[in-house]
């Protein structure tokens, strides 16, 4: 499993850099490319990719210190990304020496001893380096950027816009584990009944005041592996996405134009508010994302929405008059 996860992570990070793909898109492409579809390997690879990307500025800084007088850019894409992953695995995941050795062996198996031999010296240095001392050695804005895992240009922009005190609060909050929210899907059944089914699967929820069917997850297992999720009893949805549909407030008689609609959180929420009556025209320019949208509409029992493959920057192939237009770019995973 570890070898497959390392192979997926190396290749996915490379696609992200080459074609500016998202974590999810690059992993989906790599899984198909390498024919690796094991759920455990994919889950492990996804965690590596997300955390390595989130901490990339610090990882690259430390890697370049370790590799000095050379740098990451002196090596192939595969070697560069394995060094990044090894740094995450050993310094941020806090692996023990046996786990670090197993990870290194997996990298050698994926890339080959010949490719990694020029940087073998770096792996021992990585184990002994103190990341905090590297961060303390940076100056001013660069130190703050490293300490909070943000790019310097973003830190500088926020300070100009918000001032230093508010920027510090923002940067620190960005590193907190985000709250998970779900929407109970009343297109499937009564809210009270659906809540009881989730409780049977060990999910603990806290309602949000003044907002119908939206709950904060207090305790959870893997939500997407639950039978209630597969049957469409609930949808995992960011709170800001929920507020879009609530603000639009569509009625059962409305025709809604949902632009940038995939993967479908807002579409399905509006269909729920409309009680599966009326009409939703769902526009997206990505055929791949519309396939995901269709899958979600089936899972969530949405019957009133029509997918339209089109670019909203061009004239749309429509003659209908919409009562409500929902435009919320950039949308999920853009």
What are the functions of these language-model segments?
Residues 1-334:
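S-adenosylmethionine
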